[in-house]
């Protein structure tokens, strides 16, 4: 007689890269329920000033960078998937702190620090796990698949989050996020935490060979802050609705999902650097247009256009990063996040 636990286990993915895709999808959906609304939650619901809201995310970035070397050492000793798993309870703690958040500066810094530590442990483990499971000749396609899966899974997240916040409040969204995050951790451990041998030394943090990439690293970080914090606040003043914000988030996902995979696959047989160069120029132009929007139709049009351009750029860029990091993956990504 087959044990019912063994029976259901057969339906879960067995290949490591597929497990990563599934886990990333579930986590991305969970976080997409609230991520676009976090700046608005702090600014609108908790009455923080724009400067305080920005300080929250700047401090998060600092903690993220400082914690990255610690996460790399942790992953080298306890396993890369355990590093990812550590990020889950930390993110759940962050959600709890958000729920009970007050405008006190101390609580603002603590909540921000927990988010930074959560992301550091998750992304250090994810970069290492993905590098180990992916294949160099197909890395453009595989990075594209990961990005595409992420985008597809977040397609309805902001919309659902906006509806739930509008009719049930933030508490319901926080609870659903926690439940889904636990599920993403379970998926990742289906094959255990296979040992991925690598070495990381704190000395690499000060290795000058990474300094030549500092402008690129800074541009990546700036994009995250502007896209995730400044842009949502900026367009909320135009849209004035959580529901509309949810639609915007879903549109961003819908417009770029297929492009991530198709451009990634194409880049495996083309000049990745050439794609990256011309798409970077176009994306810079998109940011100029985003600063000029004043009406709701303009918000929707520029959001879709910028998402498409970013999708073209991201897959070949991500593949080049993993290729460049070979041999010292942890050191490369630690330095990237510090800058």
Region locations from a protein language model:
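Hydrophobic core of transmembrane alpha-helices in multi-pass small-molecule transporters
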Residues: 25, 105-122, 218, 297-313
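C-terminal ends and interior cores of transmembrane alpha-helices
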Residues: 89-103, 281-295, 299
